[in-house]
Amino acid sequence: VIEITLRHTIIRNIENRMILIPNSKINSATIINSSYGDSSTCAFVDIGVSYDTNLDKAITVMREEIMKHPMLIDHRSADEKKAGVPVVVVRVINLGDSAITLRAWAWASTAINATIMKYDLFKSIKERFDVEKIEIPYPYFNQIVKNE
């Protein structure tokens, strides 16, 4: 927040742009403050793998690559640690037309670090999948031309 007046509020977004919002909108809106209290942020790392993929292997590779990232933090509660919940949870979240989508929950200390970490992880996981021969599929179509 840069300035609050009787008629409007000016905020600066992550791209350093000034946004003028009428207070009537703010009064009736849900406000998300990412820096209030706990600034740690979860980055969802979603990657599609082929239906032929050994899912346990792909999950292990994703978890290992994320655990190596220097911006990763352990965001588990004491109860989660006691229960043996891993620092990085990876789950199947979708069975799509051309891929099985895996999602990893990776925590960083700030929203900026989470964004940087996420983009770094896309690269390192892709490179590791190449080494491990884990396919990231892409949709393709066969076109059939009928002679009439």
Regions found by a protein language model. Give the residues of each.
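Solvent-exposed, non-transmembrane regulatory segments of membrane-associated proteins
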Residues: 33-34, 49, 53, 63, ...
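Soluble accessory domains appended to multi-pass membrane transport proteins
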Residues: 1-82
